[in-house]
Swiss-Prot record:
Induction of its expression: By cadmium.
Source organism of the structure: Tetrahymena pigmentosa
Propeptide feature: residues: 1-2
GO molecular function terms listed in the Swiss-Prot or TrEMBL record: cadmium ion binding
Function: The metallothioneins are involved in the cellular sequestration of toxic metal ions. Binds 12 cadmium ions per molecule.
Pfam families recorded: Metallothio_Cad
Protein name per the record: Metallothionein-1
Keyword Cell membrane: no
Length: 107
C-alpha cells in the first residue's frame, strides 16, 4: 500500500489538487479537507489545523492506469488520484472517483 501524505494539499501540491477535476480530491469533512473550494486556507500557509489523512489527491500516482482525453495529465500528475469507472474501464473519469485496481488502459 502506498504511503499517504498526511499533510493537507498545500504548497507544490495545491495547484493540481485545487484545479484538476480529475485529481480525485474528495475530502469533505472539517477535519479531512484538502483544498476544497470553501476552505481555500488549506492551499496557503502551512496547513496547520488542516488534517488530510485520506485524501486521494495526496496519494502517489498510480502507474499504468489512465486513458481517455485526460490520460496524459492523469498519468503524469502525482496528485491525480488516478480514478476509473469499473463499468467502462475508463480511467480518470471525474464522475466516478473510485480506486483503479484492474484498469487495462495504458498497459
Amino acid at each position: 500500500m502506498d504511503k499517504v501524505n498526511n499533510n493537507c494539499c498545500c504548497g507544490e501540491n495545491a495547484k493540481p489538487c485545487c484545479t484538476d477535476p480529475n485529481s480525485g480530491c474528495c475530502c469533505v469533512s472539517e477535519t479531512n479537507n484538502c483544498c476544497k473550494s470553501d476552505k481555500k486556507e488549506c492551499c496557503t500557509g502551512t496547513g496547520e489545523g488542516c488534517k488530510c489523512t485520506g485524501c486521494k489527491c495526496c496519494q502517489p500516482a498510480k502507474s499504468g492506469c489512465c486513458c481517455g482525453d485526460k490520460a496524459k495529465a492523469c498519468c503524469t500528475d502525482p496528485n491525480s488520484g488516478c480514478c476509473c469507472s469499473s463499468k467502462t474501464n475508463k480511467c480518470c473519469d471525474s464522475t466516478n472517483k473510485t480506486e483503479c485496481k484492474t484498469c487495462e488502459c495504458c498497459k
